[in-house]
Amino acid sequence: MTSNTGMLPLTPGLGPLAPSIYASNTNNKVLIIDNGGHTLKIATNNPSQPHIIVPNQVGKVKNEKHQIMGEELINYNDPSEVRSRNPMEKGYITNWGLEKEIWDYAFKRDDMKIKPQDYNLLLTEAPNSLDDLRKTMYEVVYEQYKFKSLYLTTSSTLGLVHIKQQLLQYQQQQHQPPLDASMISLLKSPCHLVVDCGYSSTHIIPHFQNTRLNYAIKRFNIGGKLLTNYLKEIVSFRYWDMMHETKLMNTIKEKTCFISKDFIFDIKRSQIDKLNSNLKIDYVLPNYNDPNNKTGYIKENLNNNNNNNDKNDKLNVNIEKDKDNNDIKSKEEGEEIKLNDEIKKDSTTTTNTTKEEDMEQVLSLVNERFTVPELLFNPSDIGMNQAGLAESIVQSINCTNSNLHIPLYSNIILLGGSTLFPGLKERLELELRKLAPEQYNINIFQPQDPILSPLYGGIRLAQQPDYLKYSISKQDYEEYGYNYCNKKFF
């Protein structure tokens, strides 16, 4: 059957804070916090107040006693001198003392100025959190901050709310092209499968009528943090010690990495002609003394570009011949790529300097660009005994009632920063097509901003006239305790 990988429509005038969605619940102040492992995304239901993004980290500068956070942490002159602490482990808040420091900073910012006791709180957490962690969270929210009420949910549910509301509003606008059949299905279907690939881990979360099917949620421990750390290890092994350059390596990962559509083919291509491969990218490392080069940049190499067009055709011919001779075997036939062995055998990371740019440090990346994010599909490449993205989706769907399988395959939504790798949607569709029943349609969708969609969904939800009936008031918590909260939310 047919398959589709689509980007949701972006309508002129249909921003996340479009005035038409602020119609009902503006009298009750609501604070929305999408509490991610990498950043906090914070907004209120006041349409005139912008949202903010705050690093969910506290930094300490070498040889200094004071801590830094927020903008000071982002803009610190030499990030390699900063040691950061994160209040979360594997996606769950385990250090509420540290998390509270970050919240306090965010609430006191000039663009927020939040008094918690005047607000109702809408907060996200990772699915299937532990009761002990939730108990501490309730104590912080109700007893220390004294929020008027709490509504606890997941980023996946809020992202789904935003996407459906966005499609509905698009459909209602005049002079817009009509939605295609797959978009209409996404809007009207009661079944959706959300892939939330974030900083700490990846969750596969099926929904029925906007409600999570907790028994079918699947998780594997590959996220943006692990991918960045893996890239750090590869580069540090091959040339420079980058183990204290987490921020820089995260930036390089985001700017240079992609998902290969044919991993074996690209591995072979990178081995045949390392220096002149079209896969090669030269990244100029930052000079922290230069205000114009704080993050580094991709260097244009005109000589390589001119030579690559002719050489690439020859390489492709040679590789196809190798395929015919069974030198390249498919993964289905049993070939396993041992990335750790490959790292030791093949040092493709080099430095390049010219007389004109003798002060530049240039990091050349070839197969690192796609072997790192390949872990999303094959965690076993680094010895993790976990299913990858496509297999986890199939396992999650198979846990649900068989009547839900067709609509779940037809309405897959990608959320989270780690879904932004170029080629991920296309590769996922190819992998699912191999695993799913032939008669099923596979449709994969991604919002324009998969990182902020949950926050926008929270804003929309907070505007509903019946929002407060889904939350638990401070009075109810004080009367019935945290077990009552768990029963109502979960």
Swiss-Prot record:
Key word Transmembrane present: no
Cellular localization per UniProt: Cytoplasm, Cytoskeleton
SMART domains associated with the record: ACTIN (SM00268)
Example of a GO cellular component annotation carried by this entry: Swr1 complex
GO function term, MF aspect, one: nucleosome binding
The keyword Cytoplasm is assigned to this record: yes
Record keywords, A-Z: Cytoplasm, Cytoskeleton
One Pfam family per UniProt: Actin
InterPro entries in UniProt: Actin, ATPase_NBD
Domain of life: Eukaryota
SUPFAM superfamilies listed in its UniProt record: Actin-like ATPase domain
UniProt record similarity statement: Belongs to the actin family. ARP6 subfamily.
Protein name: Actin-related protein 6
Underlying gene: arpF
